[in-house]
From Swiss-Prot:
Gene name of the record: ELSPBP1
Pfam families: fn2 (PF00040)
Lineage: Eukaryota, Metazoa, Chordata, Craniata, Vertebrata
Keyword line: Disulfide bond, Fertilization, Repeat, Secreted, Signal
First-listed, main subcellular location of the protein, grouped into a coarse class: secreted
Superkingdom assignment: Eukaryota
The protein, known as: Epididymal sperm-binding protein 1
């Protein structure tokens, strides 16, 4: 292979990598020596705190980990980036939102469409077309305290039999990895490919913020009739737009 061919191959590989991780072809004229300097220069990484989604960085809101100015995905640990951050591990990413809109079509599971490497991915908001926020799908259970063992259903949890993934206080979906969670206490985070449509589709917007808390499902709070509802934009407290589910 001559030097010119090696040069072209190197740039082609770089462009494919950049597209796959950022979702767009970079402006080559902007790739100066400072393009990939970390946004947190001289700021200590805070691995003890959890990711906060969405977070605001340089005026834009992000619902997932990003690679802006970095080769490794990271997130802010404050709602507005103030120099506090951490590198993202698999269990730091937000959960998939199903259904989600991509290129005007509703999807109820992870898809490969639009991915050069045909890797499964999902949107982390109700509309990829609107927010362009996404992540690769986990195809196996991960995290938890059982070394990523697969879900076991049915299982006993709090003296009841459960048959599907459960939502915890951090909006993560988890599952028991033994037949009796009450006795064994073993669990994993659910694979994204195990999850299907859990919430209504358009016009609900998931997640949405109500009284400064994120919700990933329809809720009954704030209604006298105990009917469930959802916001149709991320910030209900600002926009006050909603529908019954």
């Amino acid at each position: 292979m001559n030097p010119w061919s090696s040069y072209l191959l190197g740039w082609t590989t770089f462009l494919l990598y950049f597209y796959e991780t950022s979702g767009k072809i970079p402006n080559l004229s902007s790739l100066g020596k400072h393009e990939f300097t970390k946004p947190w220069i001289s700021i200590k990484e805070d691995q003890k705190d959890s990711c906060v989604f969405p977070f605001v960085y340089k005026g834009s809101s992000y619902f997932s980990c990003i690679k802006t100015n970095s080769f490794s995905p990271w997130c802010a640990t404050r709602a507005v980036y103030n120099g506090q951050w951490k590198f993202c591990m698999a269990d730091d990413y937000p959960r998939c939102i199903f259904p989600f809109i991509f290129r005007g079509k509703s999807h109820n599971s992870c898809i490969t469409e639009g991915s050069f490497l045909r890797r499964l991915w999902c949107s982390v908001t109700s509309s990829f077309d609107e927010n362009q926020q996404w992540k690769y799908c986990e195809t196996n259970e991960y995290g938890g305290n059982s070394f990523s063992k697969p879900c076991i259903f049915p299982s006993i949890f709090r003296n009841s039999t459960i048959f599907e993934c459960m939502e915890d206080e951090n909006n993560k979906l988890w599952c028991p990895t033994t037949e009796n969670m009450d006795e064994d206490g073993k669990w994993s985070l659910c694979a994204d490919t195990r999850i299907s449509s859990l919430v209504p589709g358009f016009p609900c917007h998931f997640p949405f913020s109500y009284k400064n808390k994120n919700y990933y499902n329809c809720i009954g709070k704030g209604t006298k009739e105990n009917l469930t509802w959802c916001a149709t934009s991320y910030n209900y407290d600002r926009d006050h737009t909603w529908v019954y589910c």
